[in-house]
Amino acid sequence: MRAQPRTASIQASLDTVTKKWWLYLLLLLLFFVPTYASKSYDPEKSIDLIGQVLSAPLIYGLPILMPVAKLVPLALAVGVLLYGNRMRRPFNVYVAVLYLALAFLQTSAVTDTYGLVVISGNLALVLIVAVLWVWEVVAEKNDFKSVRRPKWRWWVAPLAAISLLAPVDATTMSPDFAPLRLITNEAGLTYCMMTPVVLAVLTLFHPSVNPAVLRVSSFAGMLLGAVNMIVWFGLESWGWWMGVMHIPLVLISVYAFALSHASTEAM
């Protein structure tokens, strides 16, 4: 019986902290944490260094997982919409495990030029999101019971589908609509493509979801989305299509973040 009051107390603290502006400033500052490389490198080569990590992170070392990482979240998202709280724990557990894996394995790579590289800021940011999802597995504040929702709320669905399919060649950054590639590409093992799917589900059930999880997950999505907008539409405009692929992340994250701070009485 003591566990429930303790859980409620921790959740209340998280709800309070995630309303504070300084938390988001601290999360933003994580981007300024230096990237680790086992071989010394010229700071002017930072973009190339990060690009090498993101093009071949450790998590891509198991290509057999790529189609699985698309089909499982799709099944879980549909399952939550159809069966409600009977699918809550599988959904929460999958997202928590996925984010834990992404925190350590999508932010790291072994490169010929720089050796072992870890994008420390990204690791810390995604790890914070992952820890909150681990907490949600314990607290179960996401309530996925069947509810009537306005039709306009479904605008997130097609954008989430685009992110899940991600018709892009991650090597050339060019469009790739080959049917087999849509099923087997890397999207299911990336934070930027999977977060729109996760947030889309949460926004469809808002306000009966964990507010702390929604706030931090969406803010991290906003940050990473903004960085990708700058990179692919500015610094590396040759890869503009990859920028297009990040538009769902930006739009859904901004929407989810605004929703998470909106008064529930107005819903």
Stretches with model-predicted labels:
Residues 2-20, 138-142, 257-267:
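Membrane-interface capping segments at transmembrane-helix boundaries
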Residues 21-35, 93-105, 121-139, 148-173, ...:
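Alpha-helical transmembrane segments of multi-pass integral membrane proteins
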